[in-house]
């Protein structure tokens, strides 16, 4: 498995993983293929820690769901993983690092950053908003989103978003996707101050000098 889409659910914000899911993908000639037969989805126990109610309200994983499940430290990435794709993927990579996974050599591909580059004028770029956008507010999108915020469902939703990103940005292969993700992480517009919404390249020189002080 060279590339996977991965998602985690945690017991609290920036917490321990209580669910991890991933599926292998390939990118070839701007087309995405996902192998559902090799999808991995596992709940994990976290010792004496308790799931916060705020997190429970998001993913609906209860304490009773993780009783008797493997300890989170048992999680291993599939062999030969080079690329990990996900929405706000840095969060998930930090999470699996808590399992003892060496994430240093991993190339992270962030669909959140890519979506902001592909559709800069959208009001929101979370998974649900993007699914409604690419489906033009269809009933099918509503049905798909009923399982959102569980790791396995978010894998499929992220794959749907990525398919459209590949088309919009004309990305042909996985390494080009990684390069585009890295580039997309660099802000193009200012998000604060009197020049909020302005392109960084168009900012007055004196304002840029003030920012750099």
Summary of predicted features, one role per range:
Residues 17, 36, 118, 177-184:
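Generic preference for hydrophobic/aromatic residues in regular secondary structure cores
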Residues 85, 154, 158, 197:
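A residue-level signal for conserved active-site and pocket-lining positions in enzyme catalytic cores
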Residues 99, 117, 133, 161-168:
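Active-site catalytic microenvironments for nucleophilic, acid-base chemistry
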Residues 111, 127, 155-158, 204, ...:
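Short runs of predominantly hydrophobic/aromatic residues within well-ordered alpha helices
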Residues 1-108, 113, 120-149:
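Conserved non-catalytic scaffold segment of RNase H-like nuclease domains
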Residues 161-213:
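Acidic two-metal-ion nuclease catalytic site recognized across multiple nuclease folds
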Residues 60, 136, 156, 160-163:
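Charged, amphipathic alpha-helical interaction segments
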Residues 11, 150-161:
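Acidic, divalent-metal-coordinating active-site segment for phosphoryl/phosphodiester hydrolysis
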